A protein has these predicted regions:
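Active-site neighborhood of glycoside hydrolase catalytic domains
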Residues: 94-116, 123-213
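Short, well-ordered beta-to-alpha junction loops that form the rim of enzyme active sites
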Residues: 16, 68-70, 119-122, 165
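Active-site-proximal beta-alpha loop/turn segments in soluble metabolic enzymes
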Residues: 78-88, 121-134
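Functionally constrained cores in energy, signaling, and assembly domains
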Residues: 10, 17-19, 120-125, 191
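N-terminal catalytic cores of secreted or lumenal carbohydrate-active enzymes
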Residues: 1-114, 140, 144, 148
Length: 213
């Protein structure tokens, strides 16, 4: 983060637990709490924010943050658990979007600059840790719900990124979701570097959607 080193100016942070955590946790796992009144940011406050503050101190400037979920709360999912895939139950799409907005506001309330979100980390992966599957159709259906929630919460400057998975299928996912209605809602396509080269997919995205990051 130091300008004398690599000079990183962005970080990606998980919402709720992920595979880097010692145990699974949720800020609000209470199905009865539709208003998120018992939303508890303390795990992030205690375990993540100190590292973020240290990174910002090393950088000498605010870092731009991307927030990504590994899984919605277990009760919102078809399999009733955070791990082993499952999908977001459609009836909880609106509440899940508000949950993500709440995370953004908690970071902002502490002076951190959230720049963007992805809709789901690795939406094709079924893992033994926190994971949630979105088909093309499911991610496309959730996109306008999330976009509307951001606007409703005064967060319409937050960028939405699709995919957030390996780059060999990035163009396939982008082209399945983006049309004249959804394209203005999306700022970019997030890619992981895990498998092979497949750089042509990034070239195809750049050619077909030159405005995307």
């Amino acid at each position: 983060f130091s300008p004398a080193k690599m000079g990183y100016d962005r970080v990606r942070i998980h919402m709720d637990s992920c595979d880097f955590c010692a145990e699974m946790y949720e800020a609000d796992g209470d199905e009865a709490d539709a208003a998120l009144e018992r939303f508890d940011f303390s795990r992030t406050e205690e375990l993540i924010l100190p590292m973020l503050r240290d990174a910002q101190a090393a950088a000498g400037r605010p870092l731009k943050i991307m927030l990504s979920p590994w899984s919605p709360p277990a009760y919102m999912k078809t399999n009733g658990e955070r791990c082993h895939g499952g999908s977001l139950r459609p009836e909880y799409a609106g509440r899940w979007a508000e949950y993500i907005c709440r995370y953004i506001r908690e970071f902002q309330a502490r002076g951190f600059a959230v720049e963007r979100i992805s809709l789901q980390n690795e939406p094709k992966a079924v893992q033994t840790w926190d994971s949630c599957v979105y088909t093309d159709e499911q991610e496309k259906a959730f996109l306008p719900v999330m976009h509307a929630a951001l606007a409703r919460n005064g967060l319409d400057d937050i960028e939405i990124f699709l995919w957030d998975h390996n780059k060999e299928r990035a163009f396939e996912r982008a082209s399945a979701i983006l049309d004249e209605t959804t394209r203005p809602m999306v700022a970019g396509v997030a890619c992981h570097w895990y498998s092979g080269a497949h750089f042509e997919n990034l070239d195809m995205i750049r050619s077909a959607y030159p405005e995307l990051k």
